[in-house]
């Protein structure tokens, strides 16, 4: 793509390749949400409903990191492995995907998240847990989600979207999984560490609990959008070149 924001064309968005990409996003998001929500439910079952402790936080963060690593990897060669409306939004603002195709990515991701959350609730018989604030207000929660999502989408650009990435692209799914796991360790006890509107929306639909759901749309979209704009216009402009290793 040219790197400029583009609306796109319906014939491109409904091509065979695009339809396959939507299916890939649906499946990848379903896999990620099933694993992520399932880890939270498993912790609740194994601890008899005890509050999340440090060991549990690490376990949930690791499961989300591993789950996203796999979800991105299985979709990378088909759809790019976005698995997240905030990632798609950031890539659209950076001109890496058209707005129209991005909308269909969102639909696929949200449907995948809903199905994943409903399936894990059905299989376990346990109410689906949702993201929520703990010890912080709505404003602080939004800021936290902006920061952690900025880090996630910046990582996506640096390891997967930047045409200068070279061999770094081969470890993109690992890096993306690592940053999500690390961010959950930081933000989990406060905002929940969503970074992903679909990850929050799917469980909200499955449980019928939409409390503060707007935080998990506003924060990630602002953070993802900022990361896309910063990386696109600072590092992917025509006159930028990477520093040679001998110059460090």
UniProtKB/Swiss-Prot annotation:
- Where is it mostly found? membrane
> What would you give as a GO molecular function for this chain, any one?
water channel activity
Give the comment on domains: Aquaporins contain two tandem repeats each containing three membrane-spanning domains and a pore-forming loop with the signature motif Asn-Pro-Ala (NPA).
Induction trigger: Down-regulated by chilling.
Matching SUPFAM superfamilies: Aquaporin-like
From the Swiss-Prot or TrEMBL record, give the protein name: Probable aquaporin TIP2-2
Q: Where is this motif: NPA 2?
A: 196-198
Q: Give membrane topology per the record.
A: Multi-pass membrane protein
Give the source's domain of life in one word. Eukaryota
Task of the protein: Aquaporins facilitate the transport of water and small neutral solutes across cell membranes. May be involved in transport from the vacuolar compartment to the cytoplasm.
Question: What's the gene?
Answer: TIP2-2
The secretion signal range is: none
Listed GO biological process terms:
one-carbon compound transport; water transport
Entries under Gene3D superfamilies matching the protein: Glycerol uptake facilitator protein
Q: Give a brief account of the tissues where this protein occurs.
A: Expressed in roots and leaves.
Pfam family membership, one: MIP
